[in-house]
């Protein structure tokens, strides 16, 4: 609540969404300070930088529905790693199938080692194209925890940073929506996402 009142959630987002319209530099300085105080909370708080990807590649309707929630304190995660896809994200197999009946995408599969896996909003890398086995078959999806369909099957036993849960997630017909265009999930969106994440991780490391 204190961070929200200070305007430090979604601080790089435009003011019309509840942000401060700050550049990335003040955000990284804040990430350093927060990590120095509490590394676990720093992990949870800093994953708000996922909203940068949604802001850059999502549509206007997604902006209006999701960005204010992050500015008001809701949490985010990026769901990339799987049991058989870690550093090689081209091997991601979590399946995304469009349901004409439901009018949305349904996600099925397992994600592993997901930092802040119990977050409110998730950016999920999933395989949307039949027959494609490499990165060109992957798209980015937005999953809202309020929709249900995802269970936290395991919380990892780590040596430190226990305040930030690292989870194994099971997706079972979880309703989601496409972020941006199909097939650009890895080659464009994850690359942009990770560029911002590296700055945040570097700032946390300095703080620690």
Which residues are covered by each model-predicted region?
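A glycine-rich, basic-preceded beta-loop-alpha segment at the flavin cofactor/substrate interface
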Residues: 146-149, 153, 165-197
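Flexible, glycine/threonine-enriched loop-and-boundary segments that flank and lead into catalytic domains
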Residues: 1-13, 79-101, 106-112, 116-121
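A short, Trp-centered hydrophobic/proline-enriched beta-strand micro-motif
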Residues: 72-80
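Short beta-strand elements
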Residues: 91-98, 125-126, 169, 173
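Short Gly/Pro-enriched turn/cap motifs at secondary-structure boundaries
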Residues: 84-87, 113-116, 132, 158-165
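A short core secondary-structure module
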Residues: 104-150
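Internal helix-loop-helix
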Residues: 2-72, 114-117, 201
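Extended amphipathic alpha-helical segments enriched in small hydrophobics
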Residues: 198-208
């Amino acid at each position: 609540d204190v961070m929200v009142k200070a305007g430090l959630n979604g601080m790089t987002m435009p003011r019309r969404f509840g942000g401060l319209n700050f550049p990335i530099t003040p955000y990284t300085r804040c990430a350093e300070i927060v990590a120095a105080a509490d590394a676990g909370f720093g992990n949870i708080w800093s994953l708000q930088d996922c909203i940068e990807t949604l802001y850059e590649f999502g549509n206007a309707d997604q902006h209006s529905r999701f960005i204010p929630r992050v500015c008001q304190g809701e949490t985010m995660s990026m769901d990339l790693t799987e049991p058989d896809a870690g550093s090689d994200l081209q091997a991601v197999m979590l399946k995304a199938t469009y349901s004409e009946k439901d009018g949305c995408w349904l996600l099925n599969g397992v994600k592993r080692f997901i930092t802040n896996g119990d977050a409110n909003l998730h950016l999920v890398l999933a395989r949307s194209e039949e027959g494609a086995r490499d990165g060109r078959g992957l798209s980015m999806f937005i999953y809202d925890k309020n929709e249900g369909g995802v269970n936290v099957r395991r919380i990892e036993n780590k040596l430190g940073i226990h305040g930030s849960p690292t989870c194994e997630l099971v997706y079972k017909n979880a309703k989601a929506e496409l972020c941006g265009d199909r097939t650009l999930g890895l080659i464009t969106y994850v690359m942009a996402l990770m560029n911002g994440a590296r700055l945040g991780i570097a700032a946390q490391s300095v703080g620690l």
